[in-house]
Amino acid sequence: MALRIRQVLHPESKDEYILTLKKPLDAITKYEYERPVQAHTLGQLNPEEKAWLNQYIHLPEDIEPVAEFKTDRQICQSKDADLCLDHTFFKNHDDYEAEYEYRQDHDGISRFRDILSAVNAKYEKNCPSKIARAAADLQK
């Protein structure tokens, strides 16, 4: 299970913060629950935001972050999916990741492979999550 608060930058208007809970269904599938929040840390969640979160998990009062990192994301939108290119800054290293996020059902794996082949890149099955990579980074 993982919690994230993502800051979405809007140069022309006020930035927004989105709280995401990632809860596993099985070894492959995760449910993702999202909502806008006013807080940029878990400790700053207001009672309404905490109540929303408590619908899905029990949130201990003394919860502490396991890791912190920053990701700059560029998004190329299409009718079927978003191609997301991430540059993530961990405490001890940076990494890069391309994600293909579905907007609607289609043969996304083939489409993603076509996009990657245009730049001589190859698809590899899912790498460890950013949370797992952040935890490994703390061991460096």
Language model: regions and residue ranges:
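Charged surface patches that recognize polyanionic ligands
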Residues: 1-78, 118
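Intrinsically disordered, low-complexity acidic/polar segments
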Residues: 12, 28, 94, 107-109
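Short alpha-helix boundary/capping segments
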Residues: 37-40, 100-104
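Extended serine/threonine-enriched, polar tracts that run as long, contiguous segments within proteins
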Residues: 75-92, 101, 111
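Acidic/polar low-complexity flexible segments
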Residues: 103-104, 108-140
